[in-house]
Structure formats: C-alpha cells, structure tokens
Curated annotation (Swiss-Prot):
UniProt-listed GO biological process terms: DNA-templated transcription initiation; embryo development ending in birth or egg hatching; embryonic pattern specification; hemopoiesis
Role according to the record: TATA box-binding transcription factor. Members of the TBP family are differentially required to regulate transcription and development during early embryogenesis. Commits mesoderm to the hematopoietic lineage during hemopoiesis, acting via mespa. Binds to the mespa promoter.
Region annotated Disordered, chain positions: 65-115
Subcellular location: Nucleus
Signal peptide positions (record): none
Tissue distribution of the protein: In adults, expressed in the gonads, with expression much higher in the ovary than the testis (at protein level). Shows a small amount of expression in other adult organs, including the brain and kidney. Embryonic expression is mostly ubiquitous except in early gastrula embryos where expression is asymmetric.
Gene: tbpl2
Name of this chain's protein: TATA box-binding protein-like 2
GO CC, alphabetical: nucleus
GO terms for MF: DNA binding; RNA polymerase II general transcription initiation factor activity
Family of this protein: Belongs to the TBP family.
Length: 312
C-alpha cells in the first residue's frame, strides 16, 4: 500500500467517525485507548483476530451441516482481508463493526448454553389409566321439554290433528305421536310440551320441532322456547351373572333390593347423580342423566364393583 492509499484510508476513517455521534468504541468494547488508536488499521486487525479465536472455540456440532460455519471463513476474517487489501464495501464502517460485535456476543452466549442433543422418545404416563370396561351403554329413551309460549285449546287440537288423543278424565294433556322420529308428545293447555321416546339428543329436538309445527298449522301462535333435555335412559349388559344379595349387603347406603317387589337392585350413585337398576342376569339400566357423558361415567364407576360380585 503506497502513501496516497494510506492517506485516503486515514481520511475515510476520520470522516466516518466524525460524522456519527454514537460511534463510541471505548464504551462498547471496554477499551481504554484513544481515538487515534482506534483509527489504526493494525489495531482493528488485532480485534478481528481476537473475535476469530472466540469463534473458533465454539462447539457448533449441534448445527446441521448447511448451517455450520466452522469450515468457512468468518465474517470478521473476510472483512480483515478486505481491509488489508484496501477493498471496502458500500456499507458505513459503523454498521460493519457493530455487526461484528453482535456476532461475537451471540457466539459467546451460544457457547454458554450449548447442550448435547438427545433423541426424542415417547414418555410413559406416570399414573396408569384405569382399565376400561369396553362396554358402551346404549341410549334407549330421552325425555325433553319445550315451551310453546301460548295457551292451547286441547279439545280443538285433538279433533283436528292426526294421531292425537285427549281424555281429560284420565290425563290433562293431549297425547300425540309421530313415526319419524318415533316419539310421543304430551301437550298441555299452558303451552308446555314433553317429548319422549327419542334415541338421541338430535332426534329429541327434531321431534319437538315437528310437534310445534303441527300446533302452528292448527292456528296457534306456537313458538319454540327453552328446549331442554330432562332425562336420559341407557342400558347395557355386562355378560355375567351378579350376586345381588352380596352387593346390597356391602353397599347398603347406596342400594336397595327387595326381590318380592322388584327383581332388580336399585343403586343410587352420588357422583354422577344416576340411578342404576341392576339385574341378576347382568343387565344394567341407567337413568336420571342430563348428558350422555354422565351415563358413561356412572357405568365405568359401577363396572369394577359388579365384577367383584360376579357369580362363579
């Protein structure tokens, strides 16, 4: 490098440093040297060599091959070579040197938190899951209620509607039936209606809407308000005979068994609040649920108890 090139280089550094108010090396790097010492190219070369040593000490084996930079020259080495050959990029010297400092700090942090990689393996649950019965109770009947929100003339409905009967001496409601879904409705003069016989929640709602539509066609301003499932009945078979006498003696506070009056044992579960009818043959009927999940939960609770009283 001749004298003219060195002079132009020194002039370039002077202009760059003088034009930036936050270009302070001493505060950023903890150096005690003067500004003239920073302008010396040999001092910048020694700084680059120190950063190179820090980078070479890093263990980058955890990175993929395409991201590993151990076999490639670092950015500091490239800039050092460019400075020695008198070649400079269009970026200001401040941004280039600040990027070098950030790279060095990032490399040091990576070295501190570098942990060996281990293969991922599925973890076994700490608490074993209780054995499932494998039996799913089937819904047999759903009872729902709805408010038609208008007074009704039951005699007029019974005379005009098909499949409807009304005997006020026996029961103060119109009994109406439809085939699809196969259900029965009890329609009261207050506008309240009870729908029973559906096998699912969707069928119960559909049937209730059909009954409300029939009442509308008969000239009443019927609405469809406050539909609610009031009771669900499910049943299943455990496929083994049960000693009901032993069961009632062990669970006296929850169960009652009087074979002279009713052949099944009545078991009143507290949580969920379900009533179970248990028969010697292994048939079980569950009633009193508002949601089908309560039926499933109640059966899973009673199944281990029934296995304990299985007839040999």
């Amino acid at each position: 490098m001749n004298m003219d090139e060195e002079a132009s280089l020194e002039s370039y550094f002077d202009q760059t440093i003088a034009g930036s108010s936050d270009y302070i090396f001493e505060g950023d790097l903890g150096l005690q040297g003067s500004t003239s010492q920073l302008q010396d190219s040999s001092f910048l070369s020694s700084l680059a060599s120190q950063e190179k040593d820090l980078t070479e000490d890093l263990d980058l084996s955890f990175l993929p091959d395409e991201l590993s930079t151990q076999d490639e020259p670092s950015q500091v080495e490239k800039e050092s070579k460019n400075e020695d050959s008198g070649i400079y990029t269009d970026c200001p010297q401040k941004e280039s040197t600040q990027a070098d400092i950030d790279t060095s700090n990032s490399a040091q942090n990576t070295s501190q938190f570098n942990l060996p990689m281990t293969p991922m393996t599925p973890m076994t649950p700490m608490t074993p899951v209780a054995e499932s019965s494998g039996i799913i109770p089937q819904l047999q009947n759903i009872v729902s209620t709805v408010n038609l929100a208008c007074p009704l003339d039951l005699k007029s409905i019974a005379l005009q509607a098909r499949n409807a009967e009304y005997n006020p001496k026996r029961f103060a409601a119109v009994i109406m039936r439809i085939r699809e879904p196969r259900t029965t409705a009890l329609i009261f003069s207050s506008g309240k209606m009870v729908c029973t016989g559906a096998k699912s929640e969707e069928q119960s709602r559909l049937a209730a809407r059909k009954y409300a539509r029939v009442v509308q066609k008969l000239g009443f301003p019927a609405k469809f308000l406050d539909f609610k499932i009031q009771n669900m009945v499910g049943s299943c078979d455990v496929c083994f005979p049960i000693r009901l006498e032993g069961l009632v003696l062990t669970h006296q506070q929850f169960s009652s068994y009087e074979p002279e009056l009713f052949p099944g044992l009545i078991y009143r579960m507290v949580k969920p609040r379900i009533v179970l009818l248990i028969f010697v043959s292994g048939k079980v009927v569950l009633t009193g649920a508002k949601e089908r999940s309560e039926i499933y939960e109640a059966f899973e609770n009673i199944y281990p108890i029934l296995k304990g009283f299985r007839k040999q």
